[in-house]
Amino acid sequence: HRNALIDTLIASDQVRNTMHELQLKGHTSSKLERRARRHAKSVAANMSHGKIRVFLSLLTWFWNRLYSGVHVSGVEVLAQSSDTHTLIYVPSHRSHVDYLVLSYTLYMQGLMIPHIAAGDNLNMPLVGRFLRGGGAFFMRRSFRADPLYASVFAEYVYQLAQRGHCLEFFPEGGRSRTGRLLPAKFGLLKMCVDSQLRGLPKPLAFVPVYFGYEIVLEGSSYLSELRGANKKRENILDILSSLKLIRKNFGELHVNFGAPIKLDDWLANHKDKNL
């Protein structure tokens, strides 16, 4: 499935047109095709139901150790909306726990687990492979220096939506260290709108999600950063050392789903405006 999707990406009109433009600037066709395939492999998820089942079993144990309760509200409307729309989850971002608890909550409610846009800083040895199996696909912080990468990534988002896969990404781009919402970054939002305008079997609907923590798992590192310490890039040793936190209790966790924002309706209401 993953290899077939990568082949489709490379053969798409969007990627081929970008390659043609780069050929006019002196790049060779064979090198561009190898680069495009390398980009696609670096991005694409490799969702495995077997890995997901193992992952979710571990998460059940994890939540029971870490939290005194996980409370969910607003999920009832999602099943009905998913019949007519492909859902795009757009949560607030406070913790690395966010995407774990969202996938877990949706699975326990009998809903499709989303493909999750993750920063390539999480694509570490072993961890990255495991996250891909759970539906993560990886993205660079900036696409500006590489138009071929940008084209491959945008086509990947379109192909996922074309196949009816739910998506998840954080509009803030990164985790908020202060608890306040960060200004939205519009790259992935634009790709979703562009995908809708290209034509999809089902229109898209954005689902706001709020995570409320009594105590944030990364609270101590956030405090250090706010006091002036340098922000650390994630690595495997940090993840392994964080396992000691399971001896603590972090109180209750609340997951609140907002009403889906149907993109087809929104576009129809704004068709006379310059978007």
Model-based region annotation:
Residues H1-L275:
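Membrane-interfacial terminal anchoring regions of lipid-handling membrane enzymes
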